[in-house]
């Protein structure tokens, strides 16, 4: 098959061309002439031959007649085999290649047409030899087809044209048939019988039936004269299954009735009517020949049914050979000349033969793919071209922009130069004016000097005083200038220090009472790290200098200095003492090195407000938390125009610093006194360790700090010791160095450090604190917990309305149950860390900040709880503190009425802690939760049970289909039958292809038979049946492939997988089960096949040897025949010479005596006798040759049969080789098969149900 893609030598794909059918090649009709010998009847009428042969291509009537030239001329001696080899064999070869072919025998009555086409039993004509040659050619093509992809279908039909009516020679009941024309298939006869033949015997049987039905009658010129035109049509369909291509070729073998004259044939009645119709159709044939020869615009094919049938053979798509049969008798001279003239005209006709091959879908797909590749390639080339052009355009645009910029710059430079030139001109003018002014001033100065010198003696005292005043003024001006420059330098230096120094962000907490609003304000004080004392000294120096200036300078200078100072003092930002006292700043430190750490601990968990005392334009957080570089507690940076400080400012700052130090000392003294009290109390207590919880000090998520709880019990005192690790201040410097406004407002502060129990934040990593708390006898004193901010945990109402047993409950998750079980009978009471607000605020801020922020990851809550999860925290303060607490309680109760919602705390464990106030019992899971869990588990189990049932049903159905489906070969035979019916040549087409083929076949049948004919409905029903069966088989194969694909782990994907050989073999093996039962039988059968193949191969060798021997004998015989023919020709020449001599002698005999005539007659008789003997010898040799030819044909047929048997045996052996090795029979499989056989009817019924379910 021609491929639409052509590759050159370089491997590049050439430009694709649209796949076209083979182009026709113009060729003339081949015309040969055959002259029969004189018949016995003609010899009896003393008729003689008037035909003269010049060579193998020229002939003339009489010696001096015109010559007729043809492609080949056959004389009296040429045999049937020679005619076939020269005329018919090339047509048959082209017919096998896919061309249409036609062989026509034309001539007068009794000229030998039927003998040439049909022959007799002893000497076969062209038709039987053509059939034999076709089968031989098909067998050769099958031998060359190693892939077994070629399929052949040979159909044969016969018709006759009798009295201008078409009859079916095979089925005599079909008469008066109609001629149709198809766009692709050409001319065809509607309703004619087409018989598929598979062997030569079937073809011979068809020919015998057709010849018996032909119209034959006896006339004066022929005892068995054909009274009709007969046409034998042979159609060959060749299908290449691998390439999905097909070729359809037709061969027409035409035996025309002879033209005749009524007075010669003696036709009367019906014979006369037959002769008229014959002559009419032959005359129409002559008109067509003339029209084709002359190149007329219109060819009268429709004048006769004969020319209509032969339309493709004459000037159409066919390779045509015309045999003109002539009679040598002088009685038929006119008819012979007419026949020769007909042949001369016919050989000028040109046909357009071509291979009748259809363009396949595969070729079109390849062509489309090639076009798509070329399109993609051209698209990429266009993209590259456009990309390169765009780059060039972009480069040009960039160059243009650069040029424009250069032009603009050059214009600017020109303008600048022009402006400079103009300024130079103006400067020159100004300079000239100044020079003139100087010259004038010199003149005036000289005049003044002269005037002063003249009055020097008169104004001496005045000049002395004036000089003193001028000196003082100059000194004052110089001093003032120096001070101003120095002050400017110092201001510049301060500005640089402010830009380069770092500012601490001191977080001052507004420690309101516990009953205040939940929003707690923090004030950020930005302080400089500069030295205030040095600045003050510098300011004092400035003041002293200014005072000196005031004493020495005049009043204007003093006024200017005072104005400057007054203007600068307006920018001083000094907070009032009352404002600072309202913030209750408490740093809880012993020294100034831990200020930042103390601020961090106090601010943990509080929400920071956005109000600032002042702001700095340049903040450097890198050193803000550095302990060694910490500034004083309150320091205010100076603005850019900060003037020298006054005494009041110095006094204010000194008082403020002294007050902070005094407060620190008082707090330290208070703390030391508390420590002594605690130590004295712990000596009378007994210590019991409850439990130890190991936690990580670095605060990763989900892990707590290591805390050791120790309960010291006595009669009325409980001492709690809390040991935990603190965090180095240096580790907090980067995380809490400085907070900006946006961070504070969005409440996304960094995690504050853990709650610590230390009162002095030094670099020591572990500290211990113990405190003694007196337990009152009255349980109502538990209300003192409100001082720690736990009033939010309680229910509505004041502390007076609370019940004695109401406690705050911390509800923990399941993770804490195990720890609680170890402490079943112990209630732990946690006391406060410190006396000051620092420790209390830490715990309070933890609860409040978590509650207000809504997130629980910042500060882990450390609490001690009993077995029920109840936390009890008691605190007893001094009377002063209790009075403050009562005020706080009233405000907190008001807040409780507005905010009543459970508080959620987050511990470092995985489960959050919920504080409940309604009961002291641990919450238990609800019944609805348990029911939902059970439902989920039941749903899971139910889905698994359903899946198991479906899997079991699938496996059972697949095993049943395995046992009861028909074998693969049977289904393949059925499938191929249906596919051939629809004209499909692939074994596994898709459903779309099947539907399309059905539609095409039905439309073709409608065109052939008509929409209302019975044949059309029969064909349509058969097409529908084939379509339904094929669709059903496709569904079955798909279902089986899916089942077996899941069983044997093959990848099935519809028709593509089913078409694969591995899938076919797997399905075949699974369904036939040959590998279970047939191990020994297969081996024995395979051995028998091999031995039989060996025997047949030996027989074929012997047969080949016999054939070779016969061929050698045949060659020897033919050589002998050729020698005899040469001798006969020589003797014929001698006879001719002697005949000429006899004629001369006869002419002389008339003048000679009777005695001389007798002698000549005797010589003539002897010569004739010799000729007769030679002719008999020739006939004998020809008979031997025919018998040898028949024997050779028979041997060839035997050889082909043997070869077919060998192929069949090889195929079976190949199937046996492909079959898997037999497995060991399984007794379980035998039991299952016996069980299935017993329950066969039940299983068959279920199989049909399963099959319907699959459908």
UniProtKB/Swiss-Prot annotation:
The gene is kif7. One of its GO terms (biological process) is cytoskeleton-dependent intracellular transport. The keyword Oxidoreductase does not apply. Pfam families: Kinesin. One of its GO terms (cellular component) is nuclear membrane. Residues 813-834 have a biased composition (Acidic residues). This is Kinesin-related protein 7. Keywords: ATP-binding, Coiled coil, Cytoplasm, Cytoskeleton, Membrane, Microtubule, Motor protein, Nucleotide-binding, Nucleus, Transmembrane, Transmembrane helix, Transport. GO terms for molecular function: ATP binding; ATP hydrolysis activity; microtubule binding; plus-end-directed microtubule motor activity. Belongs to the TRAFAC class myosin-kinesin ATPase superfamily. Kinesin family. It comes from Dictyostelium discoideum (Social amoeba). Residues 1-26, 454-503, 530-564, 579-628, 661-686, 795-864, 915-934 are annotated as: Disordered. InterPro entries: Kinesin-like_fam (IPR027640), Kinesin_motor_CS (IPR019821), Kinesin_motor_dom (IPR001752), Kinesin_motor_dom_sf (IPR036961), P-loop_NTPase (IPR027417). Residues 454-491, 545-563, 583-603, 915-932 have a biased composition (Low complexity). Residues 608-628 have a biased composition (Polar residues). Residues 28-349 form the Kinesin motor domain. The keyword Cytoplasm applies. Disruption phenotype: Kif7-null cells have a problem in the localization or differentiation of prestalk cells in a kif7-null/wild type mixed aggregate. It is found in: Nucleus membrane; Cytoplasm, Cytoskeleton. ATP binds at residues 107-114.
């Amino acid at each position: 098959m021609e491929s639409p893609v052509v590759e050159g030598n370089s491997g590049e794909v050439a430009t694709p061309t649209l796949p076209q059918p083979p182009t026709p090649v113009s060729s003339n009709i081949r015309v040969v002439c055959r002259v029969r010998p004189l018949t016995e009847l003609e010899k009896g009428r003393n008729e003689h031959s008037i035909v003269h042969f010049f060579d193998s291509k020229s002939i003339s009537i009489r010696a001096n007649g015109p010559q007729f030239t043809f492609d080949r001329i056959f004389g009296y001696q040429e045999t049937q085999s020679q005619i076939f080899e020269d005329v018919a064999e090339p047509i048959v070869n082209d017919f096998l290649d896919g061309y249409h072919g036609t062989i026509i025998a034309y001539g007068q009555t009794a000229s030998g047409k039927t003998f040439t086409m049909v022959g007799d039993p002893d000497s076969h004509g062209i038709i039987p030899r053509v059939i034999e040659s076709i089968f031989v050619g098909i067998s050769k093509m099958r031998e060359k087809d190693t892939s077994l992809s070629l399929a052949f279908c040979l159909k044969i039909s016969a018709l006759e044209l009798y009295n201008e009516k078409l009859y079916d020679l095979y089925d005599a009941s079909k008469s008066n048939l109609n001629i149709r024309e198809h766009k692709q298939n050409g001319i065809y006869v509607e309703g004619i019988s087409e018989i598929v033949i598979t062997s030569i015997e079937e073809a011979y049987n068809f020919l015998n039936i057709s010849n018996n039905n032909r119209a034959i009658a006896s006339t004066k010129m022929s005892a068995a004269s054909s009274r009709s035109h007969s046409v034998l049509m042979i159609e060959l369909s060749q299908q290449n299954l691998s390439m999905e291509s097909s070729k359809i070729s037709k061969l027409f073998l035409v035996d025309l009735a002879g033209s005749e004259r009524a007075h010669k044939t003696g036709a009367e009645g019906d014979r006369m009517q037959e002769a008229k119709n014959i002559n009419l159709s032959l005359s129409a044939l002559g008109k067509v020949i003339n029209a084709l020869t002359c190149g007329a615009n219109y060819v009268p094919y429709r004048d006769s049914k004969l020319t209509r049938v032969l339309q493709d053979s004459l000037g159409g798509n066919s390779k045509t050979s015309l045999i003109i049969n002539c009679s040598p008798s002088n009685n038929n001279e006119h008819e012979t000349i007419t026949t020769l003239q007909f042949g001369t005209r016919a050989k000028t006709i040109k046909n357009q033969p071509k291979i009748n091959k259809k363009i396949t879908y595969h070729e079109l797909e390849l062509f489309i793919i090639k076009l798509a590749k070329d399109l993609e390639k051209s698209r990429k080339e266009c993209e590259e071209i456009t990309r390169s052009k765009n780059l060039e355009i972009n480069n040009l645009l960039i160059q243009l922009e650069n040029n424009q910029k250069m032009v603009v710059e050059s214009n600017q430079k020109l303008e600048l130069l022009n402006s400079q030139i103009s300024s130079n001109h103006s400067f020159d003018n100004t300079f000239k004016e100044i020079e003139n002014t100087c010259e004038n001033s010199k003149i005036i100065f000289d005049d003044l000097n002269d005037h002063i010198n003249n009055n020097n003696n008169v104004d001496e005292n005045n000049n002395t005083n004036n000089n003193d005043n001028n000196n003082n003024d100059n000194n004052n001006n110089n001093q003032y200038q120096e001070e101003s420059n120095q002050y400017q330098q110092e201001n510049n230096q301060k500005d640089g220090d402010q830009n380069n120094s770092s500012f601490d962000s001191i977080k001052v907490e507004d420690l309101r009472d516990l009953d205040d609003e939940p929003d707690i304000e923090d004030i950020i004080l930005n302080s400089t790290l500069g030295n205030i004392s040095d600045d003050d000294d510098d300011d004092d120096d400035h003041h002293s200098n200014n005072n000196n200036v005031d004493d020495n300078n005049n009043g204007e200078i003093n006024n200017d200095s005072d104005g400057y100072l007054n203007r600068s003092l307006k920018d001083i930002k000094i907070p009032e003492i009352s404002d600072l006292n309202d913030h209750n700043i408490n740093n809880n430190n012993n020294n100034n090195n831990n200020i930042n750490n103390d601020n961090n601990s106090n601010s943990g968990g509080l929400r920071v407000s956005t109000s600032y005392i002042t702001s700095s334009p340049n903040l450097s957080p890198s050193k803000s938390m550095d302990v060694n570089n910490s500034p004083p507690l309150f320091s205010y940076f100076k603005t850019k125009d900060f003037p020298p400080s006054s005494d009041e400012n110095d006094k204010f700052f000194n008082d403020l610093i002294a007050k902070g130090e005094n407060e620190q000392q008082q707090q330290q003294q208070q703390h030391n006194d508390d420590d002594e009290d605690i130590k004295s109390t712990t000596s009378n207590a007994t210590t019991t360790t409850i439990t130890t919880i190991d936690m990580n000090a670095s605060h990763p998520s989900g892990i707590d700090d290591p805390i050791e709880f120790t309960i010291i019990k006595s009669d009325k005192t409980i001492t709690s010791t809390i040991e935990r690790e603190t965090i180095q201040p240096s580790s907090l410097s980067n995380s809490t160095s400085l907070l900006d406004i946006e961070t504070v407002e969005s409440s996304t502060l960094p995690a504050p450090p853990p709650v610590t129990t230390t009162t002095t934040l030094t670099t020591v990593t572990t500290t211990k604190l113990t405190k003694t708390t007196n337990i009152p006898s009255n349980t109502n004193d538990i209300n003192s917990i409100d001082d720690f901010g736990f009033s939010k945990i309680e229910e509505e109402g004041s502390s007076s309305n609370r019940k004695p047993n109401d406690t705050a409950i911390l509800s923990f998750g399941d993770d804490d149950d195990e720890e609680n079980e170890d402490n079943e009978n112990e209630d732990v009471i946690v006391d406060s860390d410190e006396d000051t607000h620092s420790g209390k605020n830490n715990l309070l801020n933890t609860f409040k900040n978590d509650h207000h922020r809504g997130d629980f990851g910042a500060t882990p809550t450390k609490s001690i709880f009993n077995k029920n999860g109840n936390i009890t925290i008691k605190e007893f303060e001094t009377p002063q503190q209790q009075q403050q607490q009562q005020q706080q309680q009233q405000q907190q109760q008001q807040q409780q009425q507005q905010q009543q919602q459970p508080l959620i705390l987050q511990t470092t464990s995985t489960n959050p802690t919920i504080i409940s106030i309604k009961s002291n019992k641990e919450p238990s899971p609800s019944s609805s939760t348990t029911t939902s869990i059970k439902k989920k588990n039941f749903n899971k189990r139910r889905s698994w049970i359903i899946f198991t049932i479906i899997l079991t049903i699938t496996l059972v159905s697949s095993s049943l289909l395995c046992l009861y489906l028909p074998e693969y070969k049977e289904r393949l035979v059925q499938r191929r039958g249906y596919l051939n019916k629809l004209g499909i040549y692939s074994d596994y087409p898709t459903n779309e292809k099947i539907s399309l083929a059905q539609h095409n076949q039905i439309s073709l049948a409608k065109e052939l038979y008509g929409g209302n004919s019975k044949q059309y409905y029969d064909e349509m029903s058969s097409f529908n049946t084939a379509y339904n069966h094929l669709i059903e088989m496709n569904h079955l194969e798909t279902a089986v492939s899916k089942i077996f694909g899941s069983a044997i782990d093959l990848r099935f994907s519809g028709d593509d997988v089913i078409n694969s050989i591995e899938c076919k073999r797997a399905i075949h093996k699974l369904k036939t089960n040959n590998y279970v039962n047939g191990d020994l039988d297969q081996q024995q059968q395979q051995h028998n096949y091999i031995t039989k193949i060996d025997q047949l191969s030996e027989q074929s060798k012997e047969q080949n040897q016999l054939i070779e021997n016969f061929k050698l004998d045949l060659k020897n015989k033919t050589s002998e025949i050729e020698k005899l023919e040469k001798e006969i020709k020589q003797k014929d020449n001698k006879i001719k010479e002697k005949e000429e001599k006899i004629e001369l002698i006869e002419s002389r005999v008339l003048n000679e005596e009777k005695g001389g005539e007798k002698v000549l007659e005797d010589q003539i008789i002897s010569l004739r006798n010799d000729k007769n003997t030679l002719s008999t010898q020739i006939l004998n040799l020809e008979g031997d040759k025919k018998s040898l030819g028949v024997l050779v044909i028979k041997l060839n047929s035997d050889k082909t049969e043997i070869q077919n048997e060998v192929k069949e045996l090889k195929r079976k052996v190949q199937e046996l080789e492909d079959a898997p090795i037999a497995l060991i029979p399984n007794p379980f499989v035998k039991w299952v098969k016996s069980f299935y056989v017993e329950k066969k009817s039940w299983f068959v019924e279920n199989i049909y149900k399963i099959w319907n379910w699959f459908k």
